[in-house]
């Protein structure tokens, strides 16, 4: 970090909202956060205890649920504190650094993971006979490890570049958590180079992953159309549709914010709610809980037959 940094704390302005809505918003986001954590924990438990779900697709889903649980935890609790009292808006300099790092670490890891998951679906649908030999346990572990390491490297670069600048003036961040674009507006130095790096760094990562996902699904659709049975086509389309919904909910708001560095602060905050708060809640519902195999596993878990099966 730069030796010229003089600030010891920042003030978060919080989520843009009309006066008098603090209590209702606190209640809404508290419920959303609790449901997000419980929903993703339930998915982790079900996949862990049901041997029928020990497949590559659900292996990657456990990674996704784990990420979503913590991705929401990085930002939502602090947002709730800003709604409770003015003192909750203060965040120390080092806490801000940590929040920025883990936000981009988990966010970029999820971005890479979506790409890996689309590749997994491509192999499963396009090469069903060779799929088990191609997507082995070792291959899954290597792909998952690669996403975590890539996310860590990406976030480290982003965090170092952001806090290498001196911060000695205003300390009010126009956002409900520490993110690079609003933080850079407080720097006591020229930030044009940093903004360009953010645009290229995040833009290339997110756009690159999104393009690879689109290409994967174009190939998947072509393979699905060659499936002879209508039941097989319907099942393949259903699986892919769930993934596409989640991908659009995650990438759409993210690309909108980081590829528009001059966007308004209020708009930035509102759009950020979608991928920091709502997407982690949607994932267990859209991507997993609507799945027939998971529903069966949940029923077995409720009746206790899953644990009896493992004995």
Swiss-Prot record:
Bilayer topology term: Multi-pass membrane protein
Name a single GO biological process: detection of chemical stimulus involved in sensory perception of smell
> A Pfam family in this protein?
7tm_4
Q: Which GO terms describe its molecular function?
A: G protein-coupled receptor activity; olfactory receptor activity
First-listed, main subcellular location of the protein, grouped into a coarse class: membrane
Topological domains on the Extracellular side lie at: 1-23, 74-98, 160-196, 258-268
Q: Which residues are glycosylated?
A: 3
Q: Which GO terms describe its cellular component?
A: plasma membrane
Keywords from the named record? Cell membrane, Disulfide bond, G-protein coupled receptor, Glycoprotein, Membrane, Olfaction, Receptor, Sensory transduction, Transducer, Transmembrane, Transmembrane helix
Transmembrane region positions? 24-44, 53-73, 99-119, 139-159, 197-216, 237-257, 269-289
Q: Which cysteines are joined by disulfide bonds?
A: 96-188
Q: Indicate what this protein is called per its UniProt record.
A: Olfactory receptor 10G7
- Name of the gene encoding the protein in the UniProt record: OR10G7
